[in-house]
């Protein structure tokens, strides 16, 4: 979650409805057809496949409320989830307690800033930064520092996995007209809500403001409206490659989605697996 999003923000309150889990959502119907457009329909299964190849322990940076980490723990992996938002981690813990008791000992939650990560473990086999989470750190320097922090916590043969939207598919000029995005159930109240969304144009720093409101129909029939606002900073294909190189990674695989599709200009996503390299060794090879 963004550092500039307060714990009382509506986007945090509705998070589990906006980004439902196919495996542990209270209301399974929230996992609707729109999740395919959002990029939520197949990503968890892809993370499971990668984790089965790398083994654990697993680090998830910007873990949110556990949509990715909990299913990984269910499959038997030790998972450390890091998020800057105390409220998001509370929701994670609540979702976790609904699982079998033995799952609790496989999950460690840490409230830390991803740009200044300082964990006891530095031998993670894989680190996931899932579902646009890197973009939600809306500053170039902070995004780069997050990648550097991730590298410091990976084993020598560790893998970093990034899932970010393909910016070539975005409306760079924005979309000033609010539109209903979807109607779902609020996991906290059971009430039906509709999310309305709009976006500003990219600014000179490639930041884009995403904003709108939630209309929730309460028990008496009255509608409660709550506004939300956040920024993200989309990253282009060769920009992320240069950032990864600067952080000490090289791209091992670049795919256009979660089903191993080849990356093209029309791909909805950039799904990246990167491995560590030694700067001095790499410089020696080039010389």
Predicted regions: what is each one?
Residues 1-64:
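Conserved class I S-adenosyl-L-methionine
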Residues 118-126:
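A short acidic, Gly/Pro-enriched loop at the edge of an enzyme's catalytic core
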Residues 71-116:
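Class I SAM-dependent methyltransferase SAM/SAH-binding core
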Residues 144-156:
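A short glycine-rich, Lys/Arg-flanked "PGG" loop and its adjoining helix->strand segment in the class I
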Residues 67:
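Conserved SAM/SAH-binding loop-helix junction
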Residues 161-241:
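SAM-dependent methyltransferase
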Residues 231-287:
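C-terminal lobe and adjacent flexible extensions of AdoMet/dcAdoMet transferase-like proteins
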């Amino acid at each position: 979650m963004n550092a500039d999003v307060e714990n009382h923000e509506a986007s945090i309150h509705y998070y589990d409805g906006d980004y439902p889990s196919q495996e542990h959502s209270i209301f399974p119907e929230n996992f609707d057809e729109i999740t395919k457009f959002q990029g939520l329909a197949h990503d968890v299964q892809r993370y499971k496949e990668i984790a089965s190849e790398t083994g654990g322990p697993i680090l998830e940076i910007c873990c949110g409320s556990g949509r990715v980490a909990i299913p990984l723990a269910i499959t038997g992996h030790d998972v450390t989830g890091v998020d800057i938002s105390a409220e998001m981690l509370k929701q994670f813990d609540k979702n976790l307690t609904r699982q079998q008791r033995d799952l609790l000992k496989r999950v460690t939650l840490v409230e830390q800033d991803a740009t200044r990560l300082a964990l006891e473990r530095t031998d993670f086999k894989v680190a996931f930064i899932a579902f646009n989470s890197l973009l939600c750190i809306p500053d170039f320097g902070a995004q780069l520092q997050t990648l550097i922090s991730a590298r410091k916590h990976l084993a020598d043969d560790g893998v970093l996995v990034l899932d970010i939207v393909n910016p070539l598919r975005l409306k760079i000029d924005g979309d000033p007209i609010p539109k209903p995005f979807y109607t779902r159930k609020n996991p906290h109240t059971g009430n039906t809500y509709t999310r309305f969304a709009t976006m500003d144009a990219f600014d000179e720093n490639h930041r884009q403001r995403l904003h709108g409101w939630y209309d929730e129909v309460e028990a008496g029939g009255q509608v409660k409206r709550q506004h939300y606002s956040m920024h993200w900073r989309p990253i282009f294909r060769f920009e992320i490659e240069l950032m990864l190189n600067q952080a000490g990674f090289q791209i091992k695989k670049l795919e256009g989605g979660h089903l191993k599709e080849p990356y093209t200009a029309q791909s909805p996503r950039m799904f990246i697996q990167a491995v560590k390299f030694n700067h001095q060794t790499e410089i020696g090879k080039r010389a």
